[in-house]
Amino acid sequence: MDTGENVKDITMGNQQVTITRIAWLSGIWDGEGTFGIYRYRRTKDGKWSYCARLTLSNTSEEMIQEIIDIFRSFDITANIWRNPKPRKYNHKKEVHITVDRSESVKKGCEIMLPYLVAKKNRAILLLEFIRIRSEYKRKVDRDPVTGRLKGVIEQGYEDIIHLYEQMKDLNQVGTLDIGSSETTR
């Protein structure tokens, strides 16, 4: 029986990642993972900052290790955090994966995109967010008399805020009327 494992190989460095493994990763992320745009307040000036992030939590060490192996094949940097104790006494300890470097998030979205079903729209939105952020050029505001730096001129935030709001709506938990695929736990 052909499992599809030998359909096509994508060579990355010394390792080969098959289409089957990428499709598997995409299926796992479609069901268990999150494509997100996160907003947080900067401490110095109190303004909002936005970042792209891929996250997944699971209790299977084998699954987490396979995901990490695939990510390493593509030079995707992921942070791993193991919960030291379960949330409840009868629960297993969960492991959390976070990918938050823009280049790694972009690679992750690009390799999974062809195989995503439920969260394809989120991956596309995240890629658009990263594209806008990568094209952003800082413009400084200077005092016209002294030439002294007054700060950075905010630009492009309207598009980013719009994408953040769209992603927030898509990732809303428990609202089936807007097509959320997120599970209430």
Task: Explain the meaning of each model-derived region.
Residues 1-185:
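Internal intein/HINT superfamily modules and their associated LAGLIDADG
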